[in-house]
Regions:
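Conserved acyl-donor/pantetheine-binding loop and adjacent beta-alpha core of acyl/acetyltransferases
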Residues: 68-99
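A short, internal acetyl-CoA/4′-phosphopantetheine-binding micro-motif in the GNAT/acyltransferase core
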Residues: 98-110
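Conserved catalytic-core motifs of GNAT/GCN5-like acyltransferases
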Residues: 133, 145, 150-163
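Short, high-confidence coil segments that cap the C-terminus of an alpha-helix
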Residues: 52, 95, 124-127
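Short amphipathic alpha-helix that is part of the acyltransferase structural core
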Residues: 1-49, 54-59, 63
Length: 165
């Protein structure tokens, strides 16, 4: 009886408890930057130039989460530092870390899953570190700590967390 009720509830609410297993990381060419709750002021061109990447977590033709990465060889404490470091790393071809400077989700569970997929991507690309450039908000702090990151730097306007690879 309980199984029948659970199945009915899932169908009624269109809940797929295993959907994250079927989701995949895809590179995106375009996004609506106004949806970004962390850094909506960063335009699409900036997010894509100097080898920066935008990834989505795709499930059944829908993007469930988005993460933006830049690649550097040092930990930035501001968006300006991130800009300069990622430009230098592109020209010197010496980037050894991914900097996740924004991540957001459209469905419960998608934020955690996209970070897991970003870590897999970093391993495939032989990067040494995955570090965030996060705002000083309780939401950002809880998200990263809950997902296994460690706080490595507390700055005037940002904080950096590191995920282990």
């Amino acid at each position: 009886v309980l199984k029948t009720i659970l199945n009915w509830t899932r169908e009624k609410n269109n809940i797929d408890s295993n959907w994250t297993r079927k989701a995949s990381l895809v590179e995106l060419k375009t996004i609506d930057v106004s949806e970004d709750p962390v850094r909506p002021e960063i335009d699409l061109q900036w997010r894509r130039e100097f080898d920066r990447k935008i990834f989505g977590l795709k499930h059944k033709e829908e993007i469930k989460a988005i993460i933006c990465l830049a690649f550097t060889n040092d930990v930035p404490h501001t968006v300006r530092e991130l800009d300069l470091m990622s430009k230098v790393s592109k020209y010197e071809k010496n980037a050894n870390m991914a900097i996740a400077y924004t991540v957001w989700s459209r469905q419960k569970g998608a934020g955690k899953k996209i970070m897991e997929e970003a870590l897999k991507y970093a391993k495939i690309k032989n990067l040494k570190r995955v570090v965030t450039l996060s705002p000083l908000t309780p939401m950002a702090t809880h998200y990263h700590i809950r997902n296994g990151a460690k706080l490595i730097s507390l700055n005037a306007e940002t904080q950096n967390f590191e995920y282990s690879l």
